Amino acid sequence: MLSYANIILKKALCIPTKQKSLDEIPKTMYTVFVEEVCFMETIKNVLVGQSGGPTAVINASLAGVYETARAMGAEHVYGMRYGIQGLLQEQIVDLNECLSDKMDIELLKRTPASYLGSCRFRLPNPDVDEEPYKQLFHLFEKYEIGAVFYIGGNDSMDTIARLAAYGAKVKSSIRFIGVPKTIDNDLMFTDHTPGYGSAAKYIAATIKGIICDSSVYNLNSVTVVEIMGRHTGWLAGAASLAAGADCNGPDMILLPERAFDEKAFLAKVSQLEKERHTLVIAVSEGVKNKDGEFLCDLVSGPGAVDAFGHKAALSGTARYLADLIKAHLGCKTRAVELSVLQRCASPLASRTDVTEAYQVGGAAVEAAFRGETGKMCTIYRVSDIPYRTETGLTDVSRVANKEKCVPDEWISEDGMHVTPEFARYARPLIQAELHPFYVDGVPRHLHL
């Protein structure tokens, strides 16, 4: 444990790692720190999994968990293949054998999607079906697991909450910590969520390119761009970040937080068409009409739902709006669906996002070694200029199965755009780049 204290203390004091030992530092400089670290628990092995929809930076959180756990003395860092569902089938890998050197870690940070695989599996109520819990805790005992980390969104936090509650019920000493992840940015009690910044950066850059492309012909046209976001408009709102000195940004942004008003929408499009010959509209896939119907369902009909009651896929909102505009206003229209590109475009990942994803992974491990359980790591924004954040913790039960919407005051009065406050919030999250390692002209990734 002192070896870990040595590393962290040297970083805090700006002392080169190879230059001095802890013994050479004046005791008054580190007594309190060492006392705090020495109270940390000894954990032999840890287990980490990934769940839900992937992001461009979810593997950076995995890297943070792995490196921090090893630095703090964990002998083995095991990974769940395909989340909790794969774990129930004892699909487990030893990450010590998979991540053999620093280059593997750097490749992992730059690899999109979920390195370990994912699932959308919901644990049952243990009062109704206790068998999966008995099976899981048997595996924890078999592999001598002292802490479990689950990287995911709202539904994944439900898994951590259930495991922590069951662990308390059976008086287990295992620690359960949630690591936040979602491009939707809808987790409660955190300023923002790792994964969102990179998706927002991709959306802003793509919208900017579409605006350029749509303006090449001297004729009236409307391009409708469909962006992910089932119940919240954080991703669609990120289209506003395309605006700058060389671009006005999208002409309209429609969010799920406001019900779609067909008459007002067509009137606004007609008005804008008189001012400029090309329009670009960003729309969340989950926009509903005043009757609570998804616009996409008006095209394709209701689809299947997953284990958590969410529609498995939403698609067709942009097509619906493009057809509506063409039918009523007669101009040329095009529907563009960004789809999974929003969450896997690692060459456009935000370095800020990658860094914070790694940090929350490490903070989760530190929390477990301090004896915390049933918590999720959070990000607290200290300041905008300069942009600075700190990590914290919240009870995972406060986050599980809940959603954070775009504040009403960040949505324009007519409900068809966002205010400058939204951009001030989101712009720091898309800053800087982490350049991929290119081989034969394409990015190199790491795979199991």
Q: What does each model-found stretch correspond to?
A:
Residues 2-10, 15-17, 21-32, 36:
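Short, positively charged and aromatic/hydrophobic N-terminal segments
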Residues 41-92:
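N-terminal phosphate-binding or glycine-rich loops at protein starts, especially the Walker A/P-loop
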Residues 51-53, 80-86, 120-121, 153-154, ...:
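Short, ordered loop/turn segments at secondary-structure junctions
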Residues 77, 139, 147-152, 158-173, ...:
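Accessory alpha-helical/coil subdomains and C-terminal extensions
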Residues 90-146, 155, 194, 208:
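Glycine-rich oxoanion-binding loops at beta->alpha junctions
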